[in-house]
Amino acid sequence: PTPTHLNYTLFHPVGVCALISPWNVPFMTSTWKVAPCLAFGNTAVLKMSELSPMSAARLGELALEAGIPPGVLNLVHGYGKEAGEPLVRHKDVRAVSFTGSTLTGNRIVQAAGLKKFSMELGGKSPFVIFDDADFERALDAAVFMIFSNNGERCTAGSRILVQQSIYAKFVDRFVERAKKIRVGDPLDEQTIVGPMISKAHLAKVRHYIELGSKEGASLLCGGLAQPDLPERVKRGNYVLPTVFADVDNRMQIAQDEIFGPVACLIPFKDEAHAIALANDIQYGLSSYVWTESVGRAHRVAAAIEAGMCFVN
């Protein structure tokens, strides 16, 4: 305010929002989109991946049970061309929220026109471990961030950059841990890595494993070998936790988002080298830094070109 004027900003609901969620963590990403959308007074049309429709259907049932009026949260099922694209292009849709692949995200931006939109797209996140890091905690986190959820996560720490002085030790311990990961029935609570989402995606992951060996990276475990599975799931889309060491950051397996349990271990010399490797990528979704130095943590986090940086 001023002596003669009162200025303020007034926020209004935008209207109908198209919310497009992926298959890898379908319930969580749906709730992340739906909750703030409805809380601010908008209505939502939720379109799930055709590969994971059931959790959204259950979310719709729960919404009705909770008393959300009919028509406030709406569900659309189908393929992108038949369901997603018409939704994005519809004249009554005022905003679009999409989580998924970079390729599809580019298409949505083109189709959305002047609508408001938010995107969370692909990633090839650097997981940087300096030689002063808490080794055991960094090892635990590195294993978790690439192999949990089958490696099918956009924030997976798939490029593991390790300082040369601890690189050999880290490789040995990381491979030891990877070999112990239980692969099998997703309904078994002891299972860590379950099946890939589809046969097409399994073929993609296996293609990159073959490519890594052809490019000259050292395959230390996993690969194309078939896991020992219970009879009930033998026909599933399984791939073993796979570790490539001595990866050159220019290799395709280091540059492309594989979206599976495939780790690329890359040595670095010093802080400047680590930052250069971390930023030598087309993606910039997330990053991870492990160090006991507060100053280094702030420097590296600021220098890495990523939307999120998690320290220790």
Specify the residue positions occupied by each region the protein language model found.
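Glycine-rich nucleotide-phosphate-binding loops and adjacent flexible coil segments
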Residues: P261
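ALDH superfamily catalytic-core signature
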Residues: A95, L103-D248, A272, L277, ...
